[in-house]
Amino acid sequence: MVVNYQHPIQCIRYVEKQTAGFRNLFLASAGSKIYTYAAETGRKLAIWPEAPNASHSTVVSVAPSSEGDEPSAKKRKVSPVPEQTAKGGQPEASTAWSTIPILTVSSDGNFLVAVTGEDKCLRVFEIEESGHLKQLSERHMPKRPSAITLVDDDKTILCGDKFGDVYSLPLIDTGKSSIAPKIHAKMKPNQPAATTLTVHSKRNLASLEQQLRHYSQNEKTAEEKPTSAFELHLILGHVSMLTDLVYVSVPVDATSGRQRPYIFTADRDEHIRVSRGPPQAHIIENYCLGHTSFVSSLCVPQWAPEYLVSGGGDNHLIVWRWNESRLVQKVPLLEEGTDSEVVVRRIWALSLTKAANSQENANVILVALDGSSKLLCFTLESDGSLKAQNSIQASGNVLDLTVPSENSSIVVSVDAVREAGSTQEWRTSPSSPSTLVEAFRLKPASEGPLDWERTSEAITAQINSEGTSDISADLDEKQKKELNDSLYSLGNLRKKNMGEDD
């Protein structure tokens, strides 16, 4: 029996349902699919997309592209995609995307927002009691989304894209268009002056026939056709590729209880901008400037919202007192004397209980580096400095993590396809079952640096045994490189020539 690799889990989210009687879930994206698992058992409940049904079609909203003169905004019906046969003989949908790089869940656990890669589509799902995902809308953005977050009590999506723009759009599609319909004037295309009466040679007749076909097509496109798009509002923009987006609300003062929202945006050109929240997002409060390479991840700790932790292509993190644009600390990510490039994949701020049944919390900052099997751990001190703790050693490159409701452990998704520490070299042979997720918790030590231990949980073992979808063990080098690049693309943000945009 041939053993294949399994698609690693690129994103994983814990979903705590607020509705009584609904089960808690893990949502995970791997390859072109989203999987739901029961949080109590790890049993796989559903896969999206399901096998296509020829009797159904989906209404798709398309926003106008920023390229070209004419908006492509329209609603169109998408025919069901052809079926393929997956392992075990089950029909499998052929999709227009190969990855789902972004998942965001509403605070009540009722909705999921996902970004599918190549088709630039932002999809909203209702998370049903059974764990199945019911797609409510799919909205094709002008450019590929690079970061999303939910605001205004989960009523609004903020979406940043690779063109540097940030849009605001409702979570539930209203069906309204924010773009004034444009009526294409009836223009009379230039008709060929020649006719079959004036052209006689075979070659010229063929040329005339081609011109007449082209004229006929132009006549059709010149007809009046109103455009239609979903509600979409441009609220701010960068002149460079936007890489991350964070939304926070902080108290205006100590007595009134009023909150003021801010939007933090980072880009490829080393900038971090602090803007006011909508409807004043055009007002720039300040910048946090100090990085010398791209910024890929921003993190504002919930327990200390006056601080911002940022990282990217530099070999250090930076802690900011963001409302003052003040650099508090540069935190090295490499040991002294090490000369290599690093890329920060993601930064998390977590508040964890130190042990089961413990009331003592540990506020930690965890950092994943692209192509590294170590999770770096820090504590944020009262003066805003980061203090290094013992790191977490996973069995493969760390891709993402989530925290179940008890806050005593973390569930980490790892790459079991490539060698630990490499983004290109594949393991000589796949394991069975493949390690998709691992769980870790803080050791109950009372003194010294924080330390971690792996937990042997039945839940993660069940998720691993369920698997995702197969990757053939017989792929050629070109196919492997395409899969590598789809999972590890942050390094492409690094400019090849310092001072010049490639």
From Swiss-Prot:
Give the pathway annotation: tRNA modification; N(7)-methylguanine-tRNA biosynthesis
Q: Per the record, which residues fall in region Disordered? A: 58-93
GO terms classed as biological process: tRNA (guanine-N7)-methylation; tRNA modification
The keyword Metal-binding appears for this protein: no
Task: Fetch the InterPro entries from UniProt.
Answer: Trm82 (IPR028884), WD40/YVTN_repeat-like_dom_sf (IPR015943), WD40_repeat_dom_sf (IPR036322), WD40_rpt (IPR001680)
**Placement of WD repeats on the sequence:** 4-58, 95-135, 290-330
* Record has Nucleus as a keyword: yes
The record's principal subcellular location, in a coarse class, is: nucleus
The listed locations are: Nucleus
This chain's function reads: Required for the formation of N(7)-methylguanine at position 46 (m7G46) in tRNA. In the complex, it is required to stabilize and induce conformational changes of the catalytic subunit.
Q: What is this protein called?
A: tRNA (guanine-N(7)-)-methyltransferase non-catalytic subunit trm82
Its source organism is Aspergillus fumigatus (strain ATCC MYA-4609 / CBS 101355 / FGSC A1100 / Af293) (Neosartorya fumigata)
Lineage at the top is: Eukaryota, Fungi, Dikarya, Ascomycota, Pezizomycotina
